[in-house]
Amino acid sequence: MQTGSTLHDDRTSVSALGGLGARARGASGRLLPEIWMQNGAKRVEQALARLLCAEDHGETELMAAMRYATLHGGKRTRALLCLAAGALADTPAHILDDVGAAIEMMHACTLVHDDLPAMDDDVLRRGLPTVHVKFGEATAILVGDALQAHAFLTLASLDAPGDNRIALVRELAQAVSAEGAAGGQAMDLSLVGKHVELDRIVAMHRMKCGALVRASVRMGALCAIAEDAADATLYCALDHYSACFGLALQVVDDILDATADTATLGKTPGKDAAAQKPTCASIMGLQAARQFALDLLCEAGEAIAPLGPRAERLAQMLQRASAYLFKHAPSA
């Protein structure tokens, strides 16, 4: 993979992202991005609290641990991507909220399992003790299993046509399959202590992180626009956008693991180096990895530019990611 010949400088990157957001804001007059994101995250959290209500399921230790894993922080990036893609059409908010909640349940499942001693062996997540530390390993395994099941139950119970529900279930299942997050985690574990090419790391990141990001975007669109009924360019643009966005998120995570403190990360820093895990940051160097992430965010913006103002929320998600990178991983 060549990166050096295509790098933009920071000024170009910010200009490209800012231009997209500025056009979208000027065209819509809708909620400011920060307010929309806060409201969207709150709606999804309310849906999670409702779907994992102790009164409905009983306040068992398992249910308490499931709520702990899902309701205590997080940027809700994947759910917001779902809501942003849902804004491409007039998708009912209550459907998007539940789909976003299902995605967050699945994301929490992957985090709970990734944190286990047999996997990444981490004791902090979102600034709190990980589920296996607080509730024990056996409960943590069951939490991941149950959250996965509840995610699919949520999608199967949506107030939506059967074909839509099937498409959503298939999309989420594919994202965490052996070709998605599970396969990516297996590849991650297999690369520990090895010298590998950048392409291998990129392929692993696209599976481990990128597959669920891609599903989040596609599921938001699928709520209202069936793929076979959409303009041929729509899902192609969304797939390109999400592939770049998902990889950029993981590259940023690689950088912050090497540079940020516990308060910023919400988890133990320096874990990748301590475990001898190859990452984009360790292979490329911090500054090249940072520029790589910015280039990916710009490429994602270019992918959705033809969609015009209706993609404003997706463009604003890119701006948020770029701002986070500039804040927590400034250039040398």
From Swiss-Prot:
GO biological-process terms attached to the record: isoprenoid biosynthetic process
UniProt-listed InterPro entries: Isoprenoid_synthase_dom_sf, Polyprenyl_synt, Polyprenyl_synt_CS
The UniProt record lists the keyword Glycoprotein: no
Main location: cytoplasm
Assigned EC number: 2.5.1.10
Catalytic activities: isopentenyl diphosphate + (2E)-geranyl diphosphate = (2E,6E)-farnesyl diphosphate + diphosphate
Binding site for Mg(2+) 2: 114, 120
Highest taxon, organism lineage: Bacteria
Subcellular location per the Swiss-Prot or TrEMBL entry: Cytoplasm
UniProt keyword annotations, A-Z: Cytoplasm, Isoprene biosynthesis, Magnesium, Metal-binding, Plasmid, Transferase
Residues bound to (2E)-geranyl diphosphate: 125, 208, 250, 267
Protein name, UniProt field: Probable farnesyl diphosphate synthase
